[in-house]
Structure formats: structure tokens, C-alpha cells
Amino acid sequence: MEADFQVCRNCKRNVASLHFMLHEAHCLRFIVLCPECEEPIPESKMKEHMEVVHQQTKESQQHPAKCKFCELAVQLSNLDVHESHCGSRTEHCPHCNQPITLQVLSQHKAMCLSAKGRPEEGKRIVSSPGRKTRCDLCKQMIPENTYASHMKQCSAPNTVTRIRDESIIVIPSTLAFMDSGNRRSTVSKDVRPKTKNRNSSTKRETKKQNGTVALPLKSGLQQRADLPTGDETAYDTLQNCCQCRILLPLPILNEHQEKCQRLAHQKKLQWGW
């Protein structure tokens, strides 16, 4: 197949061997190569070709054009070289703050935004110092990066003062969130059940002859002696609530834990945790 074609010495094109002699004779006599585009042009039309094609091209190359990176006006003939140097400069991405060259900055921004909108599975999310979360115990808003240390202090065992002779337990206000309308530094509560003797003694009143009312006084030791031995032993045993960690006697611990867990669950539903 290569023998069927030959290269013309004038126009440098492949010509069929069957017509090669005729083509080369005609080409050497009437065809010349354009010095600008090196295209074979008839000699009689070379002047017109230079004026129409190459003169307009030269004039357009002198026109100013804006660089797509710095928007400066540069001659069109020098625009490619200018944009090559200008696009190699770097700027920080506004989303990830990484230095990116101007040539690929627009594509990087699109990828960066899509990556932020769809975080990868299994990727560890680092809590930022500005974000806050709510403590389940004290219900205070605390920074996420201090949540672990806060929980160690917030869930520490509470100090309980028990006065045996008057049957009073003084408990710090870790359950303040259970009663939003009544927040106090400490909660004092008589956890002893009321007995028939105690209720009847408080209801009976004896009027003296001078019109004054005399209320019978009963000491804490006397009230404690009225309780059954089994109940008294149960009230001497204190355990922590599994939710709020306060110490309570066994007879009221179960009821308290149910209420405490129910309120904590309602709080989580309310805040969308």
C-alpha cells in the first residue's frame, strides 16, 4: 500500500502514484506554501490569502482580553502564557482552609462542599470547642470537649447528712431538674412513713381552761420506736439512684428511680437527643 502513494516535494502531501507525475509538475509551477500557516496556496491568490486570513488574525491577537484568574486586560497573543503563570498562584479554600492553586480552586470548592454535606461513614467527628451539649444530671449546657471531665465531677457521690434522732435526710440539689419551679441548694425531706399513731397524735388537740391549745410533743426517738423493726432496718440502708446518683433509703428508692428515669426520658425526647 505504501508504494501506491508518494510525497510531493512541494506541498509535502501524499499523492497517488498513478497521478504523482502530473500532480508534482502542476504543483511546482502554480502552488506555493504560505509562510505563515504553511498551507499550499495558489500563487495567484497568495496576496488575497495573506490579507484576508493572516492580517485579521494578527489584528485580533492584539486585542485585549481579561485573564480568568486576576481579570487583568492582557493581549490575546500573550493570554495563554499569562494565565499559565497566574493560575499557578495559591489561595486558601474558604471551606477547608487549605492552599489550592487557582487553576483547580473552583473544582476543589465544589468537591469540598459536597464532602461536607455528605460526611463519610465511620469518619470520626471531632467536637469543636464552640459546640455545647446538655448534661443529663445537672441539665447545664457545657462545651463538648469538657463533657467527660464534667461528668466525673457531676456524677460524684452526694454528701448525705442523716440525723437519726429526728429522722431527717439532707440531700444536695442534684434533683433540681425534677422540679423546675422549686430549685434550692439543698433538699430536706422526712423520709419516714407516717403511722396511725403519728397522724392521730397530730390531729388530737387538748384545750386548756384558759383557751390556749396544747399540742402533744413527740420526740424523734419516740416516733422511731413506733415503727416496726423490719421497716426501721430498711430505712437505715441507703443506696444511690442509678439515674441521678443521690442516696435514698431502700423503701423509697424504687419509686424514686422510676420517676427519675421517666423524667430523664421525657427530657431527651423534648430536646431531641
Swiss-Prot record:
Species of provenance: Mus musculus
Subunit structure: Interacts with BIRC1, BIRC2, BIRC3, BIRC4, BIRC7 and BIRC8. Part of an complex consisting of BIRC4, XAF1 and BIRC5; the complex formation requires IFN-beta stimulation. Interacts with RNF114, the interaction increases XAF1 stability and proapoptotic effects, and may regulate IFN signaling.
Subcellular location: Cytoplasm; Nucleus; Mitochondrion
Biological process, per Gene Ontology: apoptotic process
Statement: the UniProt record of this protein carries the keyword Mitochondrion: yes
Region feature (Disordered): 181-228
Function text: Seems to function as a negative regulator of members of the IAP (inhibitor of apoptosis protein) family. Inhibits anti-caspase activity of BIRC4. Induces cleavage and inactivation of BIRC4 independent of caspase activation. Mediates TNF-alpha-induced apoptosis and is involved in apoptosis in trophoblast cells. May inhibit BIRC4 indirectly by activating the mitochondrial apoptosis pathway. After translocation to mitochondria, promotes translocation of BAX to mitochondria and cytochrome c release from mitochondria.
Keywords linked to the UniProt accession: Apoptosis, Cytoplasm, Metal-binding, Mitochondrion, Nucleus, Tumor suppressor, Zinc, Zinc-finger
Name of protein: XIAP-associated factor 1
Zn finger region (TRAF-type): 22-80
InterPro entries cross-referenced by the UniProt entry: Innate_Immune_Apopt_Reg, TRAFD1-XIAF1_Znf, XAF1_C, XAF1_C_sf, Znf_RING/FYVE/PHD
GO cellular component, one term: mitochondrion
